[in-house]
Amino acid sequence: MRFISPEAYAKTIVASVQDYSLLCGRAVGNIFSQPRYIADTFTQMDSIGVGSLPIVVLTGFFTGCVLALQAAVSLKEFGAVNMTGELVALSMIKELGPVLTGLMVSGRNASGMASELGSMKVSEQIDAMRALGTDPIRKLVTPRLVATVFMLFFLTIISDACGIAGGAFVSVTLLKLNAGTFFHTGYMSLVHGDIIEGLIKPLFSGFIIATVGCYYGLKTTGGTRGVGQSTTQAVVASSVLIILIDFLVTQLMIGIFGR
């Protein structure tokens, strides 16, 4: 195993942050100029959105089921089982829906982007694109960025709805609660700030998934082994950053809306 000094490691971190920032800046800047590769963007939307839909639906539904069961156990001690709908709605819309959807899409698509672009890098397809006058960032990264941000937004909404539906299913069938009471308490517990918070988070998560996945793919070296390493690094880094962004956005929303 090769050891490096703390100074060299710090320089590597700074260089990586710099390269990642430049990649993000170029990818975002390309959105506002031609060519935009619309067909590639729609292809990525289909792959990311439609391809991720089954796991998002299942994850959201069963998360809502478990959440309702656990909430009922705790609320029963206070005689407040009827408030299960409130807890499920708030938890899914503000936290679990955005975070779990981001993690599911990250595991599926950040790894896919890293492996796909990494394979292109080690097979010198990226260099061939540059030689032909095509900007790899504009062609490969920007369509994935736009598609991921756009589709993750709607996937999160679907996950929230499935989670609430799962909570309602368990509440009605196992906990013998009234469906009207479940949905009423859930609806009345929400304020505009909760909805805004739940819809802002997937925008940041989508940005992280696409840019991190593409960044590690484009920096791949070392053949097929390097592709595997880049794929693993992309999933780990994007997952950690999604949770970090969730914390920061939650703290910001609490400061703005007080909850």
Residue map of PLM features:
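Short, membrane-interfacial amphipathic segments enriched in basic
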Residues: M1-A39, Y216-T221
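Membrane-interface helix starts
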Residues: S33-V57, S239
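Hydrophobic alpha-helical segments of membrane proteins
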Residues: L53-C65, L69, V149, F153, ...
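Membrane-interfacial helix-loop-helix connectors in multipass membrane proteins
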Residues: Q70-I93, A161-L203, T211-T231, L252-R259
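Hydrophobic alpha-helical transmembrane segments of multi-pass membrane transport proteins
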Residues: T84-D127, L155, V212
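Short cytoplasmic-facing helical segments at TM-TM junctions of multi-pass membrane proteins
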Residues: L117-T142, T224-V227
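Start (N-cap) of specific transmembrane helices in multi-pass transporter permeases
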Residues: D135-T156, S230, A234
